[in-house]
Amino acid sequence: MASDLGSSLTSIDWLPQLTIQASIKGSQQNSVGRKGPGSPADPSAMLSKEEAAAHRDGKPPYSYANLIQYAINSAPAKRMTLSEIYRWICDNFPYYRSAGVGWKNSIRHNLSLNKCFRKVPRPRDDPGKGSYWMIDSCPKEDITLPRRKRPHPDDEVSQDSFEQEVNKSPLSSASEVSMPQEATQGHPMNNNSPLPTYSQANPTQMPPDSRAPTYNNNDCYKFSFSESTFPDLSCSFRSLYHSLLGKQGERGDKDLYNSMQSKQVLPPVHSEVQSSSCCMYQQNSGAAPSNLHPHNVPSISGLPPSHHQAQHQQPPYLPQQQMPRPPAPGMSLGLPSDWCSNIDSLKESFKIVSSLDWSSVDLSQFSDLMESLRQAELKNWSLDQDHIASLCDSLSHLLSTTGLLPQNHGQPPSCQAPCMPPTTSSACALRGGKPGHNMAVNSYGQNQPPPVSCGHTFTVSSGYPTQSQAPPTYSQQGRHPHRALYPPQRPTLRYPQSSDDIQDDFDWDSIA
């Protein structure tokens, strides 16, 4: 049993006999029969006839680099093409004639990767194909660059913190407050009207040696909120964004229907029909009592048809931007000029904008605000100083467009808008392109338009109920209602004809 274990492979009796000198001698004896795979030791070595005859029957004990060296040195010009090297190896060692094509790939790899072989282009006066290969007696050694030691992660953190402390200066902190130019270019304003100017009541004190900020004195970027207020502002903007999307979703198929109707070219409609489909809210804060008296408004029946049509006729297919409905009567419409620098005024603006009725408003008018909110949604509402400044600027554009923000400091918002005649392009679009749908009906069963009003108005969609009669106009002096006089004749209505509708020319009023 012991003899079996001693003769087995697990026996380690040979371990004490192993020495370094014996291993070196054994490796030298084994290396005599076959050359190493590296570069040849002697670039000018040649294969003798005796060695070629001794290894003619079997596989030669030479590496591919030695075979290439012997082939090139056998040529008189000390150069050979790849096909000539193949031919020389097959002629001197018949083993490679039936060895397949794998050895040829090894020859090509040695020529390309070994530095002692150099490729020489064929001269123009030398006919034939392929370049020549020669032996380079002094090959260029690759200069191995020293590898840079990778720093420890703790060292990287300490170095970054040190650089941040060095770069931290009053000049850099002042530049952080300003809005960069790339952020302002990413949110362009799609309006041709100039933005209202804002004055800063308490400007931020800057060091005397610092540079001037990148914003103008009239821009809305002159605010510096602490980072502790960023989560509250992000939540406010997020609730505003979701509120706008939710109220826009209530429109449903109305947007699609309105977009289809806006693309159709409708025929011109009578002036009395166009001027009769607008319901307005009138603000009497900045208007004089004489301007509100019904006697100062010219009667519609007293104007000639041509003059009346020239004043009020407007093609119904022209695009008309709709403003949102006004907030509740108890909500304050005025905001201070420095609202963007005060956190309380900014929160108040969120309440005012959220209280507006956006169900009938196309948000493409405020693409800058929606784009800023969409970018914030993509960032998961983790906003920085620059993004909040861009959102405040877009919100300022929204408030100034809707008239909630005064455009001039000395006048209220109600005095800013000029007195314009009412138009019904947006109202006709909401009714599907058929004018006269919301016209008032008098006691004789005839249609009559509502009274013409002037002042800062808000266009109301068709969701509000219409009165069966013309609403009375009140004056501030006596508070007595006065009904305007309208022509008793019925206006001629022309509807867009389609292939499915049948034109009805019968006068149904004659039966009544």
From Swiss-Prot:
SUPFAM superfamilies: Winged helix' DNA-binding domain. Residues 25-58, 143-213, 284-326, 448-512 are annotated as: Disordered. GO terms for molecular function: DNA-binding transcription factor activity, RNA polymerase II-specific; RNA polymerase II cis-regulatory region sequence-specific DNA binding; sequence-specific DNA binding. Residues 167-204, 456-478 have a biased composition (Polar residues). Transmembrane segments: none annotated. It comes from the Eukaryota. It is found in: Nucleus. Its main location: nucleus. Residues 48-58 have a biased composition (Basic and acidic residues). GO terms for cellular component: nucleus. Transcriptional activator. This is Forkhead box protein J2. It comes from Xenopus laevis. The gene is foxj2.
